[in-house]
Amino acid sequence: MREVRGANMRADGSSLRANAASLPDPDVLDAADPLACYKDKFVVADPELCYLDGNSLGRLPKRTVEVVQRYLNLEWGSELVAGWSHWIDEAQRVGDLIGSASLGAASGQVLAVDTTSVNFYQLCDAAIRARPDRDTVVSDMANFPTDRYILEGLCERHGKRLVLIDDEAGEEYVTNEMLARHVDVRTALVTLSVVQYRSGALHDVARLNKTAHDAGALVVWDASHAVGVVDMRFD
């Protein structure tokens, strides 16, 4: 049995209740939170539900419902094929908005297309093909599962070796020293997540990039769990 020491600790837990009573009222803190107003911008079907799985699927913004309805009724519904005259540029236009607002990327560098998994597959496939004389792909064990499954399939298809850095202990964080032990002239691609989906650990993107590039490897970062959450300056 673990011994708990404390001058004010009582067996009936009264000291804990007293401490809790002295804490600020959570409702008061919520009301003063500058981000509190954003709650009303999302669809909340069950106000009693404490939803903590936003890394998998976030709540539906009310604005999204309005935008989709407008597109269906006023654009597709009325413009029909004529809508392609401006739809064709939407991937670039929306990509530029995402790039400037969340990625620190200048105009012309970001496209809003396909799904994360499709894009990840295409980019990693292109990177492997761009280094035909190299036979190794490096990632980490704590990376998002779908990314690892895609890498396994690509390596099997291209006859490459997949090396997964063991970072599942502690913060699930790949240090520069850890990466340096696994990259060399055989490394075609290094791919990691900017923010780890379980632990929330934030990687040192610039430093890890330099280590991989110094070895002649290409790098693909999955920013799915970082965009809009942490400040990024890809340029």
Question: Language-model segments: what does each one mean?
Answer:
Residues 2-235:
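Pyridoxal 5′-phosphate
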